[in-house]
């Protein structure tokens, strides 16, 4: 077994979801990591901070000596046992620290002395992160970017999920992109969003598609920001427009904004707490667009929401939510979409219903 995994292997280990042991401190891991990694630190946050302070004041040798003093005996054995337990479940794991330096080498040595082998990754987290950032920057030159646009509720995300040549940006951001797009689970950190986007793009490139199909998004998907160079490529790309009649859009939005959302909240929090959280989510979502709506229209929508919630709670009937959804489309989402589409009409190369969109995409696959 090789003791060091070279940088030339970064793409492979990410594509195959290689199990990774991250020996950085928890505070480093929380800021950003990789989806198939587990944090089993060599040093905890406080220990790392003490070693860092010592390094600045007294130099490397003193810092290393302090590290050994802090992580010895029972503490050291606990760290080793955690690594060995992970390796017994995933013997094909690699380990990494921040730069592929002393922490990686020391962890590898202690594991080896305990009777098991594990390679560490050259360059560590920092180098893999640079590789992923470069992957995002290069992606628009690897496959032609194609944007799927469509009015709110047209089912763009469903089409994205049905196409092999797509990358689901909203799925990676864990947010549906609108004021009502927040999910019960938190969004990833910005760094993790970018890391996951890069891995998704690597997998897309491996399949050698002619197009990179992306849903039309703002630069911010919730609080996840698309990298500037990548978003700039999206802003210049050709657009295909998905048409969908209002009578098909309304039930889809009722499911997205109300039925599925309430199910998620109740499942996560229990019936009463879930309903209260769902109610707060609707109020907060409306509040997020209050300035654009104006006070009068915001209040009109909030009154309709309150009435729909009362009917839902007393009669177990969600249909009254269609009143405010319909009005929201009429006074806010539809005019905004049509205005934005008009500004980029010169980039639209095809427009049609779902079947026509799929036929067009199939025709232009190669």
From Swiss-Prot:
Reactions performed catalytically: 5-methylaminomethyl-2-thiouridine(34) in tRNA + selenophosphate + (2E)-geranyl diphosphate + H2O + H(+) = 5-methylaminomethyl-2-selenouridine(34) in tRNA + (2E)-thiogeraniol + phosphate + diphosphate; 5-methylaminomethyl-2-thiouridine(34) in tRNA + (2E)-geranyl diphosphate = 5-methylaminomethyl-S-(2E)-geranyl-thiouridine(34) in tRNA + diphosphate; 5-methylaminomethyl-S-(2E)-geranyl-thiouridine(34) in tRNA + selenophosphate + H(+) = 5-methylaminomethyl-2-(Se-phospho)selenouridine(34) in tRNA + (2E)-thiogeraniol; 5-methylaminomethyl-2-(Se-phospho)selenouridine(34) in tRNA + H2O = 5-methylaminomethyl-2-selenouridine(34) in tRNA + phosphate
InterPro entries: P-loop_NTPase, Rhodanese-like_dom, Rhodanese-like_dom_sf, SelU
SMART domains in the cross-refs: RHOD (SM00450)
SUPFAM superfamilies: P-loop containing nucleoside triphosphate hydrolases (SSF52540), Rhodanese/Cell cycle control phosphatase (SSF52821)
Keyword list, A-Z: Selenium, Transferase
Top-level taxon of origin: Bacteria
Domain Rhodanese: 14-137
Active site: 97 (s-selanylcysteine intermediate)
GO process annotations (BP): tRNA wobble uridine modification
Family stated for the protein in its record: Belongs to the SelU family.
Its biological purpose: Involved in the post-transcriptional modification of the uridine at the wobble position (U34) of tRNA(Lys), tRNA(Glu) and tRNA(Gln). Catalyzes the conversion of 2-thiouridine (S2U-RNA) to 2-selenouridine (Se2U-RNA). Acts in a two-step process involving geranylation of 2-thiouridine (S2U) to S-geranyl-2-thiouridine (geS2U) and subsequent selenation of the latter derivative to 2-selenouridine (Se2U) in the tRNA chain.
Subunit structure comment from the entry: Monomer.
Protein name: tRNA 2-selenouridine synthase
Organism: Shewanella frigidimarina (strain NCIMB 400)
Organismal lineage: Bacteria, Pseudomonadati, Pseudomonadota, Gammaproteobacteria, Alteromonadales
Gene responsible for this protein: selU
